[in-house]
């Protein structure tokens, strides 16, 4: 989790955690 919303690099679940 780099704190950046990257759906192309991270799965949807991971991006959701970062986005929220």
Swiss-Prot record:
Highest taxon of the lineage: Eukaryota
Region Disordered, residue ranges: 1-20
Main location: plastid
Signal peptide residues on this chain, from the entry's feature table: none
Acetylation as UniProt keyword: no
Keyword Plastid: yes
Subcellular location(s) per record: Plastid, Chloroplast thylakoid lumen
Keywords: Chloroplast, Plastid, Thylakoid
Any single Gene Ontology cellular-component annotation: chloroplast thylakoid lumen
Basic and acidic residues bias locations: 9-20
UniProt protein name: Thylakoid lumenal 14.7 kDa protein
Organism field: Spinacia oleracea (Spinach)
